[in-house]
Regions:
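Hydrophobic residues at beta-strand termini and immediately following loops
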Residues: 1, 78, 92
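Conserved core segment of the aminotransferase class I/II
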Residues: 82-125
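Nucleotide phosphate-binding site architecture
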Residues: 65, 79, 117
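Active-site phosphate-binding strand-loop segment of PLP-dependent enzymes
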Residues: 3-73
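Short secondary-structure boundary/capping segments
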Residues: 17-18, 81-83
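A conserved amphipathic alpha-helix that caps or lines the catalytic cleft of carbohydrate-
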Residues: 51, 79-82
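A structural preference for long, well-packed, hydrophobic secondary-structure segments
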Residues: 75-78, 108
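Substrate-gripping "pore-loop 1 plus following alpha2 helix"
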Residues: 72-76, 86
Length: 125
């Protein structure tokens, strides 16, 4: 993350320097917690290209998607960027943060790629 004009955003220069291997998992908090950045579609597209180009998996924690306080910003699920990215993506969501339901025990993972869903289920056992 980098701070520019009072807003945190992706540091794509730093991302390019990361040592990654195909199949590695990258965790994203979207919108970002604790800084609250709701990424723009342009930022998400650029980030998606980086994920796909390196053949990484992306786990996007979008539990705060309903807690965007900036009326100018909107949440856009990163898996909706492209069908290609969706194949690499695990999206995590739950009502507990937004609706003050801690202890409710209701969360879910959206995984459109069947093989990735199988890997996720095995990892959860």
């Amino acid at each position: 993350m980098k701070l520019e004009n009072h807003r945190f955003s992706f540091d794509f220069v730093a991302l390019e320097k990361l040592d990654t291997s195909p199949g590695d998992l990258f965790m994203l908090c979207h919108p970002h917690n604790p800084v609250g950045t709701a990424y723009t579609k342009a930022e998400l597209h650029q980030f998606a290209e980086w994920i796909i180009s390196r053949n990484l998996y992306l786990c996007s924690d979008e539990i705060h998607c309903d807690l965007i306080l900036d009326s100018e910003s909107k949440h856009f699920p990163i898996a909706n960027i492209s069908p290609e990215l969706a194949k690499h993506c695990i999206t995590l969501m739950a009502p507990s943060k937004t609706f003050n339901l801690s202890g409710f025990g209701c969360s879910f993972a959206i995984i459109s790629e069947p093989e990735l869903r199988v890997k996720f289920k095995k990892a959860c056992q």
